[in-house]
């Protein structure tokens, strides 16, 4: 496709877009997806919203303070002025952001985009080696870092020639202090709608980082598809949740969606599930985004009544078990909104809400997207047949200078790496990540199906299922199981769980290997690390 003339002086991003023949098809079928050629998403989400709703409207809450839209705009503009005039940031240059979810991280995000820069957001948990790899990949020239997380970045910045500025310390060298005397107005760079706004980092099975390139129009597109038609945010909503803003799930649910409708967002740096429920109750939050693990933990802790003000609860990051959906509905009346998205697609593209929800199904294609289940040759399979999930819409995968682009974009579709089946009504039913399908003695076994069966047992708190190599069968089903407190972890319990599973699903799917563990390996954001379970003793 032909791109609009770029406003970027530094053309690194556009120069390293995938070749056109490796792009999936793009579609802008909805009227709300028709954007002008010149578009800066920061201007639309902040300046335009302020003009419509007023400067005094609350924009950002934290446990200690609230910023209005006017305060956020003034501070973002001061930062943008400093980045342009003192740091010398040029349109198109990459700026790495490092910090937890708080108002100043949001101000930095807006400032970079207003100045025409490209945001490379990172979670504070990344260590020096990971930061080095990402900086080398994206050629970032500036880093804005919460002072509490500067240690791992300081040496990396010096070694890579990155200009590093810290915020939040309050001293004379602090970015906030340095920008405090700058003008509170700024003339935003008039970027092209298809200029790169974000480089969203993700990692493959090899661990080598990838960066997906998303345009300014893509940022608005996720709000005008999933945000508008499924989340259905309102100006009086208070959004909150746990995903980092560096993750596209968090970026959409905690920044783009609320700002698109003039709502406010409650930012939490860290929270256990119980603390999350308490915070929801304290602030009267109405839209919640978090992982299935957190919803399950809230239920297990008996904290679900604290979610009384929630009218929309989004679950993403991993498959939502039907049992969790049902328990939440039975105890609170909340219908969890399941969805599947990806960093490559920027956000959720299959989901359902309200009466359209079918518990256990991920949903149907979000308005603006088209989804299908394909075979290995890229041909649609009959309904009810498992195959590769494929999607097209207004966003797509564009890896930064990465040969793995050809694996994700095939036959005009984005191939997500998930195994699904579609029913006759167009609902998509998750089977497994493609690499979570277990082939044992010629049988295809979906790990999540075995997990759901095991979790029906009253002694099982949670579990995870993976393939383990086996000389006779090729692979066997292995389950790492967390038992409820006080339940003995002994061979008798193994046999009991195996027999129980055979009663729930086809006997050939039962876990031939069961390992009791105190906890499942997860990232700091709660996402299960299945790869750590695939090697013996890795779970414990």
Where does each model-flagged region fall?
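AMP-dependent adenylate-forming
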Residues: 43-68, 166
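Conserved pre-ATP/AMP-binding loop-to-beta segment of ANL
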Residues: 171, 182-201, 208, 231-238
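Conserved AMP-binding/adenylation subdomain of ANL enzymes
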Residues: 220-238, 245-287, 301
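Conserved AMP-binding A3 loop
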Residues: 68-70, 190, 197-224
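Conserved AMP-binding/adenylate-forming
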Residues: 65, 82-129, 244, 444
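Gly/Ser/Thr-rich phosphate-binding loop
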Residues: 285-290, 299-358, 370
């Amino acid at each position: 496709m032909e791109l609009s003339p770029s406003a970027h002086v530094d053309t690194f991003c556009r120069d390293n877009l995938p070749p056109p023949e490796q792009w999936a098809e793009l579609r802008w079928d909805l009227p709300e997806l028709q954007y002008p050629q010149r578009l800066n998403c920061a201007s639309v989400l902040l300046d335009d919203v302020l003009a419509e709703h007023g400067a005094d409207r609350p924009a950002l809450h934290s446990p200690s303070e609230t910023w209005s839209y006017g305060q956020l705009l003034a501070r973002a503009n001061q930062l943008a002025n400093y980045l342009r005039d003192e740091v010398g940031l040029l349109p198109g240059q990459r700026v790495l952001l490092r910090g937890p979810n708080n108002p100043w991280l949001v101000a930095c995000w807006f400032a970079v985009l207003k100045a025409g820069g490209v945001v490379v957001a990172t979670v504070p948990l990344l260590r020096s080696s990971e930061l080095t790899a990402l900086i080398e990949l994206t050629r970032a020239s500036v880093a804005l870092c919460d002072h509490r997380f500067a240690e791992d970045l300081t040496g990396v910045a010096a070694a890579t020639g990155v200009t590093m500025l810290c915020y939040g310390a309050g001293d004379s060298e602090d970015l906030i202090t340095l920008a405090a005397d700058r003008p509170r107005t700024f003339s935003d760079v008039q970027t092209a709608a298809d200029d790169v706004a974000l480089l969203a980092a993700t990692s493959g099975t090899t661990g080598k980082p990838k960066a997906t390139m998303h345009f300014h129009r893509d940022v608005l597109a996720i709000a005008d598809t999933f945000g508008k038609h499924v989340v259905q945010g309102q100006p009086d909503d208070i959004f909150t949740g746990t995903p980092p803003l560096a993750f596209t799930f968090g970026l959409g649910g905690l920044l783009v969606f609320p700002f698109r409708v003039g709502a406010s967002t409650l930012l939490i740096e860290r929270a256990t599930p119980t603390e999350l429920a308490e915070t929801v109750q304290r602030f009267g939050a109405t839209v919640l985004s978090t992982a299935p693990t957190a919803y399950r933990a809230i239920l297990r802790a008996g904290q679900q009544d604290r979610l009384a003000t929630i009218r929309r609860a989004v679950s993403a990051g991993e498959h939502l078990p039907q049992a969790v959906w049902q328990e939440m509905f039975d105890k609170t009346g909340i219908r969890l909104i399941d969805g599947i998205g990806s960093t490559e697609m920027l956000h959720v593209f299959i989901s359902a809400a309200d009466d359209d929800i079918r518990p256990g199904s991920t949903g149907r294609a979000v308005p603006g997207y088209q989804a299908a289940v394909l075979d290995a040759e890229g041909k649609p399979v009959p309904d009810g047949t498992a195959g590769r999930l494929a999607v097209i819409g207004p966003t797509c995968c564009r890896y930064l200078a990465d040969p793995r682009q050809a694996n994700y974009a095939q036959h005009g579709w984005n191939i997500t790496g998930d195994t699904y089946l579609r029913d006759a009504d167009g609902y998509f039913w998750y089977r497994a990540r493609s690499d979570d399908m277990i082939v044992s003695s010629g049988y295809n076994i979906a790990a999540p199906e075995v997990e759901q069966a095991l979790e029906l047992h009253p002694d099982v708190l949670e579990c995870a299922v993976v393939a383990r190599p086996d000389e006779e069968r090729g692979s066997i089903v292995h389950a790492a199981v967390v038992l409820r407190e006080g339940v003995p972890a002994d061979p008798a319990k193994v046999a009991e769980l195996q027999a129980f599973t055979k009663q729930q699903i086809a006997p050939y799917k039962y876990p031939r290997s069961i390992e009791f563990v105190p906890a499942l390996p997860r990232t700091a954001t709660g996402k299960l690390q299945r790869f750590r379970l695939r090697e013996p003793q890795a779970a414990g």
